[in-house]
Amino acid sequence: MKDLGVGIVGCGVISTIYMQNLASFRGVRLAACADILEAPARTQADKFGVRALSIDALLRDPEVEVVVNLTTPNAHFEVSHSALTAGKHVFSEKPLCVTVEDGHRLVHEANRRGLRLGCAPDTFLGAGGRLAREIVDGGKVGSILAGSCSLMSRGMEHWHPNPGFFFQRGGGPILDMGPYYLAALCNLLGPVESVQAKTSIGYAERLVTAEGPNKGSRIAVETPTTIMALVRFVSGADIVLTMSWDVWKHGHSPIELYGTNGSLRVPDPNFFGGTVEVTERSEDWQLLDTSTRPYGKPNWRSPIWPASAPDRANYRCLGIADLASSVLNGTPHRSTAAFAAHVLEVMNAMLQAGADGGTVRIASRIERPAPLSDDEAATYWGGQAA
């Protein structure tokens, strides 16, 4: 099987798991990396045995066929657009970009040039997301009527060495973490029809306590840090969504869906595995372990946590492998830019509804991605058992 050369632009914290995982996926090969700053690019290049280039040089490099855009959100549009105009396929970290208009421009540019444009999250393609999709599609819980979705924490300044961008326009919990939850929901339920929301800024300033050169500095918060939304799907399902970086502790499940025949709990959509829980009518919850399915086995533990055995399934790059397979085999890929642009429109609609009040209608419509079977998923992996 031919490998596509991959160039990574953006060598920050998230780049390590991408560079580490790329070596285990079939159809892709890490060729080079670049960053607006030379030092982080050189550090990652030396660590993973690839070339460190300038961004312009990477975009011109004939060995690079797929550009993976890991820059900060406010640079996503410029880097992805430049890569497309250079004739490269692109896979971007979430969000696709900051504005809905720029998202549509990227989708149009990729389509016009016949290039593949993908976007994280790809976590819904993991073992937990696939099993949840099987349960919903199989009708085990009936038609989904309602649900809840929660991401709440103290924020990013306690662990990230350079957290300023999280609190600028294009950041906040909805644009940073919302894509995981909304992509998981759209994969299960289809497109969103409308949103209502309330938003607030819990703290006007954030004190950086993470180790690093910014420790002790203060960040002025420019974007809402709590979003509470009612999301109406075209299917008729209503989901209550809460995203907040103003919460010390809570007890909510990441995603719960309530159907006509039962209920479903979907594991943390920031990762690829976890335990899916399902109940039929008033029966007890059934706990369904996904660790024996492709991309369900724990392989990672956060470096900021005390050392211990891996406890999370973190197979970032699965969407890149799916995109590469689509290029090599002429098949559709799943984490598409159109899908990500719909999610982006929904997130921006929440911010608009929070600022203006009322209901914001979603203009775009998307099809759910084709289900990824365990057998097909396994063909993407070339490393140790996933």
Positions of predicted regions on the chain:
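Predominantly a Rossmann-like dinucleotide-binding segment in NAD(P)-dependent oxidoreductases
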Residues: 123-220, 357
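Hydrophobic residues in well-ordered beta-strands that form the structural core
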Residues: 54, 91-92, 98, 117-119, ...
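N-terminal Rossmann-like dinucleotide-binding module
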Residues: 1-48
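Conserved SAM-binding strand-loop segment of SAM-dependent methyltransferases
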Residues: 49-57
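Beta-strand-loop-alpha-helix segment that lines the small-molecule cofactor/substrate pocket
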Residues: 66, 72-73, 77-124, 139
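C-terminal capping/lid region of NAD(P)-dependent oxidoreductase domains
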Residues: 115, 142-146, 352-386
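C-terminal glycine/acidic-rich active-site capping loop/insertion
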Residues: 204, 208-222, 228, 233, ...
